[in-house]
Amino acid sequence: KVNTVTEQYDVAQAKLVMGFRVGASSMEEMQHARLMCLLFGGTPRSKLFMNVREKLSLCYYCSSRLDRNKGIMYVNSGVEHENVEQAKEEILHQLEQIKSGSFTDEELNETKLMAVDSLRVVNDSASSMEGWYLSQMFLHSQASPEEEAEQLLKITRDQIIAAANRVTLDTIYLLSGEDK
């Protein structure tokens, strides 16, 4: 059962947040979920950005992020009130596209490179390194950014598809200015 929460507030555009459980049972599966989340909505070339925002113009912004500590993926979007239902449907459709393997090797490789590039800059500042190793501690991992990048590059198409197929919608939150 999907939990649905709607709140009313005087806002110009609706705020739609969809929470998904990633169903990862190991650190390795969480790595797969991390890359899948980036492919889904974590980069400027992601499914959500390219399709929901750019191609269909359903959202002012639309992105996904993974909370690895909780095993939850969030999709955040700003939507015109009249586009909320269509945006929800399209977000779920884009996830189904990944579940069915409807993404190119080029998209996967670009996502991997963007992930690796973001890991390369961790060592550029003491505060970034501190944040990295603190988050690793909470994950019960001792992987360096370099080791993490190496692991991400080895993730296969089939592992991304499997990660997507473990994802289940848990909660839909809508902050809307219109009384529906």
Region spans (language model):
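Mature, solvent-exposed C-terminal subdomains and processed small-chain segments of exported/organellar
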Residues: 1-74, 78-180
